[in-house]
């Protein structure tokens, strides 16, 4: 999986890309992240990459020529890469979007800054626009880091076990079940007996119910449209009944 990141501040990526899972994935050749300074494609001696907005207004706007030049240079090497702009105007980033991107040959991420990019970047150069949520960041670099991290986890071999991604929150539409490790008791809080039983069928059933309980309590909107299996329908009915009884008390 190849990521090309177009940014005015490439040094911001040094920490996230040189530690932990992303570092190991890069060393193994499972992912490749190339940083491109947009100013390298500016035309003037000052490497100007932004200018005042037409029509007036506060702040500066990122110029179209340097961004277009950077994209063209990258696409000359990787013509099938998908070009993504990080922007509050984009579609919300979630697990499903990460899965979509993980199936691409490569992804080019444009990190927006200041008051945003010239509209012609969006109309002429971009395949997709992605937002982390209903808030505004100082720039798109942090959003790009999140996208690279989330997508890389889905690349085969990046995680120690492919099952790790399979059971992540949102992978099947539900939040992840509670996790425990040693010690078996801490400050009066014990690990559920079922997890110590060695009965893998019952453990799987408990974990599935806990996913349902946690999702119902914290993110009930995620339950809309889920196609339950017959066994899941029975489990969810038990979860709903217990929840209703709890509310009625």
From Swiss-Prot:
CDD domains named among the record's database cross-references: TrmD-like
Function text: Specifically methylates guanosine-37 in various tRNAs.
The protein's name in its UniProt record: tRNA (guanine-N(1)-)-methyltransferase
Protein keywords: Cytoplasm, Methyltransferase, S-adenosyl-L-methionine, Transferase, tRNA processing
Highest taxon, organism lineage: Bacteria
GO terms classed as biological process: tRNA N1-guanine methylation
Catalytic activities: guanosine(37) in tRNA + S-adenosyl-L-methionine = N(1)-methylguanosine(37) in tRNA + S-adenosyl-L-homocysteine + H(+)
Xref: PANTHER family: TRNA (GUANINE-N(1)-)-METHYLTRANSFERASE
EC number(s) reported in the record: 2.1.1.228
Family: Belongs to the RNA methyltransferase TrmD family.
Assembly: Homodimer.
Entry-linked HAMAP family: TrmD (MF_00605)
Any one Gene Ontology molecular-function term assigned to this protein's record: tRNA (guanine(37)-N1)-methyltransferase activity
UniProt keyword S-adenosyl-L-methionine present: yes
């Amino acid at each position: 999986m190849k990521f090309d990141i177009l940014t005015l501040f490439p040094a911001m990526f040094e920490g996230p890309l040189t530690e932990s899972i992303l570092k190991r994935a890069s060393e193994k050749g499972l992912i490749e992240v190339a940083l491109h300074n947009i100013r390298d494609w500016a035309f003037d001696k000052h490497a100007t990459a932004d200018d005042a907005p037409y029509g007036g207004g506060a702040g500066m706007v990122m110029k179209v020529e340097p961004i277009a030049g950077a994209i063209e240079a990258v696409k000359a090497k990787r013509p099938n890469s998908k070009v993504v702009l990080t922007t509050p105007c984009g579609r919300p980033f979630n697990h499903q979007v990460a899965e979509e991107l993980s199936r691409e040959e490569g992804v080019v991420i444009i990190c927006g800054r200041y008051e945003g990019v010239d509209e012609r970047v969006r109309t002429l150069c971009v395949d997709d626009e992605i937002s982390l949520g209903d808030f505004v960041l100082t720039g798109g670099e942090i959003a790009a880091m999140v996208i690279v991290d989330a997508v890389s986890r889905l690349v085969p071999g990046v995680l120690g076990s492919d099952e790790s991604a399979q059971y992540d929150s949102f992978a099947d539409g539900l939040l992840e079940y509670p996790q425990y490790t040693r010690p078996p008791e801490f400050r009066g809080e014990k690990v559920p007996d079922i997890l110590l039983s060695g009965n893998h069928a019952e453990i799987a059933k408990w974990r599935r119910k806990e996913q349902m309980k946690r999702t119902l309590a914290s993110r009930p909107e995620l339950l809309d449209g889920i196609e339950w299996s017959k066994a899941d329908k029975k489990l969810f009915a038990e979860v709903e009944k217990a929840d209703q009884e709890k509310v009625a008390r």
